[in-house]
C-alpha cells in the first residue's frame, strides 16, 4: 500500500530526482481531468453557468506516469527543486516567482503616503497660484510645465488608457484655464478648447455613475473662470451647459452652508467650486497636514483666498513628491494599504508577505479613530468604505476593533458612504457586507449592516444597477454576485482565489475621484501574474497528490466499504481548498485520508455482518499496535496511516484515534466526533502540538473543540436532511439559517480571531477551517461543489 513515508525522494540522487520530477511535471501538464472526472465537451466549450460534472466511477487505475512511482511525486519540497537543464525549461516560468515576490515586498515596504497617479485638474489649480514675491509668474512653475508635457494627442488631458467624458472635460478645462492665466502655449490651449467644443455633447451619453466627484460644481466654476479670462469658442451658452449650470445651482441650494462651516463634511473636498465661504471658520476645519480633506485643488484654492502657511506647505510637499504634478487626493496611505492587503489575500498570495502585511495593518490601527478612517490618515472626515475594510482586515488579524464605529454612517435603517451622500454606490456597501459577516455575538450594528447591505445589493443586482461611482471595474458585478452566493462561512480560501483570479483586472481597474486615477498598490499586474503563477504551481502539486490518492484508494480497497471515488475527490478537495500551500502536502493528505479512513471504520462497525467479536478484536489489535500484520484491511490502513509520521506524532495521533474509536464503540460516532478527530489530527500533523500534549486538554482548546464539534454536528444533520429531501425521503426540518447555529458560528469566530489565552493562533484557525468546510457542504448544492472542484483542481489557469 502507498504511504506518506514513501513520498520522500531523499534516497534518490539529485540527477535521478530531477528526472523523476521532470517526468511528473510533464504528466501534470497533460493532466486536466482524472479518468474518474469527465465533463461533456459542449458544456465546457459553451462555458455554461450550469456546468455539470459527471463522475464515471470505475475501477481502472490511472496509467503509470512514465514508469515512475507516482507516490514519489507527492513530495512537496521537491516540486521546485529543479535546475536549468533542458528537460525542465518548460517549467522555469512556473517556478520563477522570486522576482515578483521581491518587487511586491519592496512596493509594500516603501508605500509611505501611498502611490497615486497625477491629476491634471488638481495640477492646474496648483499652477494658478501666483508667485509669492509678486512676480508675474506661477509660484509652482513645475506644475505648469507638467501640464505642458502631458497633453494627449487629441488635445485633451486625462487618463490616456480609459475614456470617460467627465474626466477628460474637467481635466481639459482646468488645464486650458491654467495656460491662459499665464499666457503660455497658445497652441496647446487652442487644441484643448477645440477638444471641449467637439466633445461636450458626449456628456449626454455619459454614465452618470461614472461622473467625477462634484463635476457639476467644479466644471461650471472653471467655465466661469475661462469666460472671465476671455477664452473664446467655448460653448458657454449651449443648452447642455445651461442644464449643467442648473444642476449646479440645485446642488448648491441643497448645501447646508452653516453645517459645512461647523464640522468636516465632503464639501471640504471641493471648495474651489463653492461660493460665499467664510474662511476664518473653514480654517478651523483644516486637516493636521494643512490640507482640506486631502484635496490639493481645494487646498490650492483655499491658499489663494487665505495665504495660510499650512496650506502652502501641504501644496509644496505634494508638488515636490510628484515632480510638479498633484494627485486628486493625498495622502492615500490608509486606502492604499487596506486595499493592497485585501487584494493579496483574495488572490491567495498573502502568505509571501506576512511581515509587510503586519506592518500595513499596524499602520492602519495606529491611525484608527472612534469615527473610523478615511483614505488618508488623521482625517476628521471618515467614510464607510475604508472603515468597513479596516474593520474586516484588522479583525481577521487579531486586532480588537469596535464595529460600533459604523453607527457614524447609519441613519434610521440605512447606511451611507458618508453623511450627505446623494447616490449610494455598490462597492462601499459590498465592503460593508463583507465586514458584517465577521460579527461576534451581540453585535447588533453588524447585524443591521448585514441586513441593509444584503437587501441593497440584491436590489442592485436584480435591477442590473452595478455601475459604481468609485471604481470602474469590468468584473465588479460578477464579484458582488459571487459574494452574495458564497457567504464568508461557506467560502473556502482556494475557491475564493480561483474566482478572484478571473475578476481581478490588475492595472485595468480605474478609480473615480475628482478625476480618474490609478493606484499601483491596489491595481497591479504583478499581483495578478504572481497569483496566476502560484496557482499553477499549487494546482500541479495538487494534481500529483490526487494521482497518489487514487493509488492509495485502489491499494486499500476503499471501494469495498461503500466509499466512491467521488467521495475521495470531495475529501481531497475540501482539504486542498482549505490548506493549499505547496509545503503542506502532509496536512492535505492527512485531512483527506482521515476523512476516508474514519468512514471505512464507521462502515465496518455499522455493518450488520460485523460481529461483536470482530469489533472487539479490531479495538484490541489497535491498542496493541498489531495493525500492519492484521488481515483486517481497515485496521491495516489505519495503522499504516498512523505510522507514516515520526514516532512522537504517531503516538499523539494514535491517542486521538483511540478516543474517537471509543466513542464509536459507545454509539457516539457522529459529525461531532468526526470533526473533533479531524481537528486533532490536523493540529498534530501540522506540528502545532509538538511536544506540548497538554495543549489538547487546555481549557481554550477544549472550548474550541466542543464548540466546533457542536457546529459540525448541526451542519452534518442539515446536510443529511438536504440529501434525503433531494432523494424524496423527507422534508428538511433544519435550516442553515438556524439562529442557534448562527450564534455558535459567531462565538467560534470570536474565539478564533480574538485574543488567545495561551493557544497558538494557527491551532485556533484549524477549528474555523474545519467548521467552514462543514458549512460549505451544507450550504452549497452538489452541482455548485462539482463546479468548484473542477475550477480549483483541474481547470487550467489562463
Swiss-Prot record:
SUPFAM superfamilies: Terpenoid cyclases/Protein prenyltransferases (SSF48239), Terpenoid synthases (SSF48576)
Keywords for this protein: Chloroplast, Isomerase, Magnesium, Metal-binding, Plastid, Transit peptide
GO molecular function: copalyl diphosphate synthase activity; magnesium ion binding; terpene synthase activity
Motif DXDD motif in this chain: 383-386
Binding-site list for substrate: 251, 469
Residues annotated as transit peptide in the record: 1-72
Listed EC numbers: 5.5.1.12
One cellular component (GO) term of this entry: chloroplast
Expression tissues: Highly expressed in roots, and, at low levels, in stems and leaves.
Protein's cellular compartments: Plastid, Chloroplast
Catalytic activities: (2E,6E,10E)-geranylgeranyl diphosphate = (+)-copalyl diphosphate
Principal EC category: isomerase
Alphabetical list of InterPro entries matching this protein: Isoprenoid_synthase_dom_sf (IPR008949), Terpene_synth_N (IPR001906), Terpene_synth_N_sf (IPR036965), Terpene_synthase-like (IPR050148), Terpenoid_cyclase/PrenylTrfase (IPR008930)
Needed co-factor(s): Mg(2+)
Name of a matching Pfam family: Terpene_synth
Pathway of action: Secondary metabolite biosynthesis; terpenoid biosynthesis
Domain text: The Asp-Xaa-Asp-Asp (DXDD) motif is important for the catalytic activity, presumably through binding to Mg(2+).
Record-stated family: Belongs to the terpene synthase family. Tpsc subfamily.
Its job: Involved in the biosynthesis of ent-kaurene diterpenoids natural products such as oridonin, miltiradiene, eriocalyxin B and nezukol, known to exhibit antitumor, anti-inflammatory and antibacterial activities. Catalyzes the conversion of (2E,6E,10E)-geranylgeranyl diphosphate (GGPP) to (+)-copalyl diphosphate ((+)-CPP).
Additional detail: Abietane diterpenoids (e.g. miltiradiene, abietatriene and ferruginol) accumulate specifically in the periderm of roots. The ent-kaurene diterpenoid oridonin, main constituent of Isodon rubescens, accumulates in leaves.
Name of the protein in its database record: Copalyl diphosphate synthase 1, chloroplastic
Gene assigned in the entry: CPS1
